Amino acid sequence: MSKHVEQLAVNTIRTLSIDSVEKANSGHPGMPMGAAPMAFCLWTKFMNHNPANPDWVNRDRFVLSAGHGSMLLYSLLHLTGYDLSLEELQNFRQWGSKTPGHPEYGHTPGVEATTGPLGQGVAMAVGMAMAERHLAATYNRDGYNIVDHYTYTICGDGDLMEGVSAEAASLAGHLKLGRMILLYDSNDISLDGDLHHSFSESVEDRFKAYGWHVVRVEDGNNLDEIAKAIEEAKADERPSLIEVKTTIGFGSPNKGGKSVSHGAPLGADEVKLTKEAYEWTYENEFHIPEEVAAYYEQVKQQGAEKEESWNELFAQYKKAYPELASQFELAVHGDLPEGWDAVAPSYEVGKSVATRSSSGEALNAFAKTVPQLFGGSADLASSNKTLIKGEANFSRDDYSGRNVWFGVREFAMGAAMNGMALHGGLKVFGATFFVFSDYLRPAIRLAALMQLPVIYVFTHDSIAVGEDGPTHEPVEQLASLRAMPGLSVIRPADGNESVAAWKLALESKDQPTALVLSRQNLPTLEGAVDRAYDGVSKGAYVLAPANGSADLLLLASGSEVSLAVNAKEALEKEGIHAAVVSMPSWDRFEAQSAEYKEEVLPSDVTARLAIEMGSSLGWAKYVGNQGDVVAIDRFGASAPGERIMEEFGFTVQHVVARAKALLENK
């Protein structure tokens, strides 16, 4: 292909981006204008992908971590033949379009990850690279490299200022993820102005210290130098950072190289001058020259041929390794093996076990029948009970290991989990103390937004943590996560509810699940022995009916359910008929029919007392105007857990007193 056509193809990306932002009167033109050459080079000369099948298993992954530059990605998707029409580019940032302001996974064909919150794209790419290495180590055989793709990312200065990218880059270097290549759009400009006001470190030295291969391209418009750098990166066994020096808003005579081109349309006059600088002789907006369209058609055809070659290889693989191939297909489709849950542990009345421990037993049981179960903890596996026994650690020396040591990198763990789930082929879990869920909350939010079935194991879920004190005792976290759309929060009351929660989490294909688990032992509840799965799946159920017509409902989740049962028994001795409702999952309960809700929370029983060792926020919906809540609306304290619970009123005596007061005030 001639240099002239290459330059024309690059400028087509630029002008499509400019025109789309201009028409929307909203957006970020500067980044696509500066980064177009590196993106063009990557997408047309290196990336293995088939626009006709965006879900090809062994495609190279591309993440635009600098998601504000979304028109760069949309232009490439359209030009290379993905199902994204020119009309969609013209409807950039409009209601109902496939071209939202920031890329959204599942919304636009070819978009691999929802990005925009800076830094997370880098960390998700690390997760994708981890998934690729694990699946390659698990399924590849001599002569059959069915998983051997690269993960490419384009990021900006803002991405590399974010802490999550530092956490993830540290992990990637440690794991020697050589199939991850990060192209850094280094333009020395941030939204507020020149970068030197806030960022002056040597990114090159920092990434070398992480264990990365680093190369610098001085001229971001030099396609040959960019290609040479990518070739070097592919040949290196370490993850690679390619710093490409660019000019934001390249070509704009008055706004190029300035922050003013970052997040606003150029304006009609500047657009005209910019296109003249590109020697763009076409008058129509959104114009694609014929020779450019013809070139991109060749790229599309090459992608189809690459997938066809892979399909032929996989057909041979299926003949040589039928069982392995079947397992691989099941995993990449997100399905579970037949009979996988037959190994589920169960607990009898009389046995006490912390839900973190029953969770660990469930995890280990299901790991035997679900080989794609993969994950770990942010340096708390022994406390979270998330070690898969008998399995190796995932490491630079053994990528087949299923136990991931994320280190004390909660945010990177959450984002990497998203990347693994986006990659496909794995059932992913990650763990930490519940109070530290705040550290990865932005990643949880993206998981919910992308509808990714990742599993969070959050242990040490209340003031019962005890001696570690208020820094480690969650109070507001439960209400906070319940407020997040699309996230299923399950706080099981005993071992059987805990196992049911794991089953539901593993069965999910389109929703993340947070398991909120106790540190302290909890008794096995008689009402949950045979009904835990059905009850947890519906979010709430009558665990212990009243002895006769109910005078009072006791509502609780997690460790407080056994307290409610004990309070019920004390009340019954005084002739007060109370029913106990276990409410492990509000979001699941809200999805039930009105009839079922009435069955669990009969409207004629207005005396309702909720019991939960967390914020009272949200309980009013269930207890009503005549109800009450035993909760915690202050921070905890440092003392033995039993003493703290007593001081905060989580005793049978206090609950009974509150219940009787409630009935007296009716």
Curated annotation (Swiss-Prot):
Annotated PROSITE patterns: TRANSKETOLASE_1, TRANSKETOLASE_2
Protein name: Transketolase
UniProt catalytic activity: D-sedoheptulose 7-phosphate + D-glyceraldehyde 3-phosphate = aldehydo-D-ribose 5-phosphate + D-xylulose 5-phosphate
GO cellular component: cytosol
Function, in words: Catalyzes the transfer of a two-carbon ketol group from a ketose donor to an aldose acceptor, via a covalent intermediate with the cofactor thiamine pyrophosphate.
GO BP annotations, alphabetical order: pentose-phosphate shunt
Site (Important for catalytic activity): H28, H262
Example GO molecular function: metal ion binding
Residues forming the catalytic site: E410 (proton donor)
The enzyme's E.C. designation: 2.2.1.1
Pfam family name, one: Transketolase_N
Organism field: Halalkalibacterium halodurans (strain ATCC BAA-125 / DSM 18197 / FERM 7344 / JCM 9153 / C-125) (Bacillus halodurans)
Subunit and partners: Homodimer.
Residue numbers binding Mg(2+): D157, N187, I189
Cofactor binding remark: Binds 1 Mg(2+) ion per subunit. Can also utilize other divalent metal cations, such as Ca(2+), Mn(2+) and Co(2+). Binds 1 thiamine pyrophosphate per subunit.
InterPro entries linked to this entry: THDP-binding, Transketo_C/PFOR_II, Transketolase-like_C_2, Transketolase-like_Pyr-bd, Transketolase_bac-like, Transketolase_BS, Transketolase_CS, Transketolase_fam
Residues involved in thiamine diphosphate binding: H68, G116, P117, L118, G158, N187, H262, F436
Keywords recorded for this protein, A-Z: Calcium, Magnesium, Metal-binding, Thiamine pyrophosphate, Transferase
Family: Belongs to the transketolase family.
